[in-house]
Swiss-Prot record:
One of the primary rRNA binding proteins, it binds directly to 16S rRNA where it helps nucleate assembly of the platform of the 30S subunit by binding and bridging several RNA helices of the 16S rRNA. It comes from Rickettsia typhi (strain ATCC VR-144 / Wilmington). InterPro entries: Ribosomal_uS15, Ribosomal_uS15_bac-type, uS15_NS1_RNA-bd_sf. The gene is rpsO. This is Small ribosomal subunit protein uS15. Keywords: Ribonucleoprotein, Ribosomal protein, RNA-binding, rRNA-binding. Transmembrane segments: none annotated. SUPFAM superfamilies: S15/NS1 RNA-binding domain. Belongs to the universal ribosomal protein uS15 family.
Length: 91
């Protein structure tokens, strides 16, 4: 259900701007997207888990705010990130 340490390190390495970058907006969005995808898979077999569904909505909102921040500051980075993550544009 949660992402493993190895998977998180892979995401950090893939989306990091510099070598020691673990907290940039792109890395945070990638980790949140992975958590959202895991929860989405969880709901395919546990459709009555309403507490986790609330957690999912909180994660989606947090990712949306981060993506808005990236879009406001650097549009080209935003477009690259959403194509890499496979998510739709924010209106």
């Amino acid at each position: 259900m949660s992402i493993t340490t190895e998977r998180k390190q892979q995401l950090i390495k893939e989306y990091a701007i510099t070598e020691n970058d673990t907290g940039s907006s792109a890395v945070q969005c990638a980790i949140l997207t992975e958590r959202i995808n895991n929860l989405t898979e969880h709901f395919k077999s546990n459709h009555k888990d309403h507490t986790s569904r609330r957690g999912l909505l909180i994660l989606v909102g947090r990712r949306r705010r981060l993506l808005n921040y990236i879009k406001k500051n650097n549009v080209s980075e935003y477009l690259d990130l959403i194509t890499k993550l496979g998510i739709r544009k924010i209106k």
